[in-house]
Design a protein with these regions (language model features):
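Metal-dependent nuclease catalytic cores that hydrolyze phosphodiester bonds in DNA/RNA
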Residues: 1-83
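Walker A/P-loop
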Residues: 208-229
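Conserved RecA-like P-loop NTPase helicase motor core
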Residues: 642-652, 707-832
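Conserved helicase motor "Helicase C" RecA-like lobe of SF1/SF2 P-loop NTPases
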Residues: 680-705
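Mg2+/Mn2+-dependent nuclease catalytic core
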Residues: 60-155
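Conserved pre-motif I regulatory segment
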Residues: 175-213
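A substrate-engagement module of RecA-like helicase motors
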Residues: 179, 238-347, 352-355, 413-440, ...
């Protein structure tokens, strides 16, 4: 069987035919709309007659000496009418269609590809192409037509294939090299207990095209145990690309280190770490246009040379390598990285590259079809709250008022005059009414025919356009005034909601608000498209509001029974309306269907059925509990039965007893400890008491602050890492004479920056104390979640409070014992941990927990250290 190189029609034309500058001033709103126009596609397709075929799959195969190039895609529509064939390419946009004088070249090229493929298949001598642009808000439609002879299309298309041939040759040759190396690749270590079975579970899941949920305790080697079998599956054509997605930067580095290790063992595999635009941008401000950024100017003229140079020299596309080549070729490093991902075998990045409805990688997932991809989701317990966040949308009343003030203050009358002159100059001429026949009868709207640049253009007024404020789309008041009026209408609706809100309130119908919001969105879009002389500050603020509004309207269209709409009065006095995605299951599942298989893993996936349910798992998907490889004798877990963090029992006496517990635990062994508290306020109370009554000269305390920059965080952690290379066994073996003289105690907050994702090995951390059960603070969203899941037949308190809280506890406890050589203690300070409702959530390796009191804990700790020392002799 000949090898294949596959590419979509869209990727082919965008990659080969692009040129010029990056310019988000004109591309931003239009391109975002193009990706969000699925509703428009369906609407137009439904209105067409029987002669209209929607979503027609087309494929072209081009043989070479060694392999075949397959170009494939879906034509939005094919119209067979009166013996003629028309290829319909639909594009949604927020732009005023009266100002769209010609279709975009890349859109024409995409339609021409479909026209050639269909003509070749049906042996048509000529064919018509129609570009259908539809305004998403008003549903106005503008058609552009062009007729092509097959012979002309063939010459054009074959030149396109010829230009792509260099890239296809490289892709095929690299794939052959990669597959051969995968076949010879062996697991780089001796398998730990249970690790071989875990590797097998991952491979079988990919084979069966399922999802796998893995509870993987620290030390299992979850990164290599998921990446290795996925790479082996790719060697059997069960995956073209591996996506390793995580919420934290440090785990992305671990994934790249794993690929590097496998490359050292002979694997030929190109990997890339995708970095956020704000972090990798060379400029102080991310102004992506040729006037503000030299890397944006002419970017598309140079980018393909940069890609080919790096591709043929490197296998690991790290941030530093991307920046090096971006500087060499003067291209945008962010867009450079995205383009390189098309040629990478492994793509490492944030969750949002797959799951975020606005940021996902459209070059892979934009056409809605399933790719031959495998998704590895690390620290997947974080995906639940991230999923809720990505698929929810707030709207603050104060944002509208602030924008209104700014519009009045900063947009000058001269700008309005210039805009009016431009509108007058571009006024509509040469219009004539056209009586519609045939398929047009499906669209009983106002029709106008125009001739522009020699191309037939048809304008159709949409139903929603007629429902506006009675003003023609062609004649507008000043933009600033129009924006101000619409902001006032929106604010009036929000003010009415605010009067009815006491704390927070669930709401049902917000259509009266959405209508002016939709119009406001369209007017801002027009303004951003037309005004080239807006100050940077005004444009930046307008764009920021515009994208927030885009997100809100998109989520409004998306909402279903998994959403709750509510208003609330915020602590800072502001008023907010929120579309709250209480259950992200369906949205996340839809994203995972973009690939062949998904492996989700975490050290704190308990209870696993809870996560499987809310993260899009099905009954036929798998779950597995990986066996812990650590020696249980190297750890002791103690539960206090005489203190609690319950709000109803908080008192100076309770705070004192908790501070005393800390003292009784740390006094038996000098070393590094972290104490985790339910809140900053609680932590500060305990710290003050500890400092006053218990702190000794041999102890030093570090206290987490509410806002710590990266430098302060690193300082905090580096104080603990000072002894990372020390051998704890030898230190303890020296007993009293050589024992560490200093104790370092970190006072931290549960669920904060030090409670998850930090790796303190060996003597860097020998003890963790967790104060409280980690229950989230009672608030409107937690109560909404509780009520929703109670109504859904689940335990609302568990889903909203207990499970999220326990996850934070397990994450904090997991900061100690990071390697097989580590020794340490875990102390849980809350009597609720002795209840079954919490004990049932303990991981299997926590079977041997011991109850203590403030009077007995010191003896228990001393016995543990002495017993371990005696055992090691």
């Amino acid at each position: 069987m000949a090898g294949e190189v596959r590419i979509s029609v869209r990727n082919l034309v965008e990659f080969i035919l692009r040129s010029g500058d990056i310019d988000d001033r004109r591309q931003g709103s239009l391109e975002n709309a193009m990706q969000e126009g699925s509703r428009i596609h369906r609407m137009i397709q439904r209105r067409m007659g029987a002669e209209y075929q929607a979503e027609v799959a087309l494929k072209y195969t081009h043989p070479t000496e060694d392999y075949v190039i397959i170009v494939e895609g879906r034509a939005d529509g094919i119209i067979e009418q009166n013996g003629e064939t028309t290829i319909d390419e639909i594009k949604g946009t927020y732009r005023d269609l009266s100002k769209l004088k010609a279709p975009l070249p890349l859109h024409i090229a995409q339609a021409k590809c479909y026209a050639y493929m269909y003509s070749l298949q049906k042996e048509l001598p000529y064919i018509r192409v129609r570009l259908t642009y539809c305004n998403i808000e008003t549903e106005d439609i503008r058609y552009f037509y062009e007729d092509y002879e097959f012979v002309r299309l063939e010459v054009w298309f074959q030149q396109l294939i010829s230009d792509y041939r260099k890239w296809a040759d490289y892709t095929w040759q690299w794939r052959e090299l990669r597959q051969q190396s995968i076949a010879e690749l062996q697991f780089p270590f001796d398998y730990r207990d249970g690790q071989k079975e875990l590797v097998s579970y991952v491979y079988q899941t990919i084979y069966h095209k399922r999802k796998l949920f893995i509870e993987a305790p620290t030390g299992v080697g979850k990164t290599i145990s998921t990446i290795f079998p996925t790479v082996k599956a790719m060697g059997k054509d069960m995956g073209d690309k591996l996506f390793y997605l995580t919420a934290k930067t440090i785990t992305r580095t671990v994934a790249e280190d794993t690929f590097s290790l496998l490359r050292e063992k002979g694997l030929r595999f190109k990997s890339i770490i995708l970095t956020a635009k704000e972090k990798i941008c060379f400029q102080e401000r991310t102004e992506c246009n040729p006037e503000q950024c030299p890397y944006a100017k002419g970017h598309f003229d140079r980018i393909n040379d940069a890609i080919y140079d790096l591709l043929t020299r490197e296998e690991s596309f790290t941030r530093s390598k991307i920046e090096e080549y971006a500087l060499k070729y003067r291209v945008c490093p962010f867009e450079f990285g995205l383009d390189l991902s098309l040629f990478a075998d492994g793509i490492i990045g944030d969750y949002n590259y797959l799951f975020d409805p606005h940021v996902y990688l459209k070059r892979f997932f934009g056409d809605g079809s399933q790719g031959n991809y495998v998704f590895l989701i690390d620290e997947a317990h974080n995906l639940l709250e991230r999923g809720r966040e990505m698929y929810s949308a707030p709207l603050r009343k104060e944002d509208l008022l602030e924008l209104k003030r700014e519009i009045k203050q900063t947009i000058t009358s001269e700008m309005e005059e210039a805009a009016q002159k431009k509108r007058d100059k571009d006024g509509i001429s040469g219009q004539m009414t056209l009586e519609m026949t045939g398929m047009s009868k499906q669209l009983p709207q106002e029709i106008t025919l125009e001739e522009t640049d020699g191309t037939d253009s048809l304008y159709v007024r949409g139903h929603k356009g007629k429902k506006s404020d009675g003003k023609s789309t062609f004649v507008r008041e000043g933009y600033a005034e129009r924006i101000s009026q619409l902001l006032e209408k929106c604010n009036a609706q929000l003010l009415s909601m605010k009067r009815d809100c006491d704390g927070y309130r669930l709401v049902d119908d917000i259509d009266m608000l959405v209508q002016p919001l939709t119009r406001l969105h369209a007017v801002i879009s027009d303004y951003l498209e037309e005004q080239e002389k807006i100050s940077l500050e005004v444009r930046e603020n307008l764009l920021d509001f515009y994208f927030k509004l885009s997100h809100f309207l998109d989520i409004y269209e998306r909402q279903d029974e998994n959403y709750v709409k509510y208003t609330r009065l915020c602590e800072d006095g502001s008023f907010e309306l929120k579309l709250f995605c209480v259950n992200p299951r369906e949205n996340l599942k839809e994203c995972m269907l973009r690939g062949r298989s998904t492996i989700l893993f975490s050290a704190t996936f308990l209870p696993i059925q809870y996560y499987k349910n809310l993260l899009g798992g099905e009954k036929e998907d798998y779950e597995v509990y990986a066996h812990s490889v650590f020696d249980p004798e190297k750890r002791t877990i103690l539960i206090a039965g005489d203190v609690t963090s319950k709000f109803s029992r908080r008192s100076q006496e309770e705070y004192y007893n908790i501070a005393r517990y800390i003292h009784e635990v740390v006094k038996n062994r000098h070393g590094n400890y972290m104490i985790f508290f339910p809140s900053y306020s609680f932590m500060n109370h305990i710290y003050e008491i500890y400092e006053q009554y218990f702190m000794t000269e041999e102890e030093e305390c570090l206290v987490q602050q509410e806002s710590m920059n990266e430098e302060e965080r690193e300082y905090f952690l580096n104080r603990f890492r000072g002894n990372e290379e020390c051998d704890l066994q030898s230190l303890i073996g020296m007993e009293i004479e050589e024992e560490e003289e200093q104790t370092l105690i970190g006072f931290c907050v549960l669920g904060g920056i030090f409670g998850e994702g930090i790796d303190l090995k060996r003597d860097s951390l020998i003890g963790v104390i967790v104060v409280g059960t980690g229950l989230p603070q009672v608030g409107c969203e937690r109560e909404i979640l509780k009520g929703y899941f109670d109504e859904d037949g689940e335990n609302g308190f568990d889903y909203s409070y207990r499970y999220p809280g326990m996850n934070k506890v397990l994450q904090a406890a997991g900061r100690v014992i990071r390697t097989a050589e580590d020794v340490g203690i875990i102390v849980l300070l809350d009597d609720r941990f002795q209840q079954y409702s919490y004990r049932r959530l303990f991981p299997r390796e926590w079977e041997q927990v011991q109850p203590v009191t403030v009077d007995t804990v010191a003896k228990k700790v001393e016995r543990f250290w002495d017993a371990w020392l005696w055992q090691k002799g």
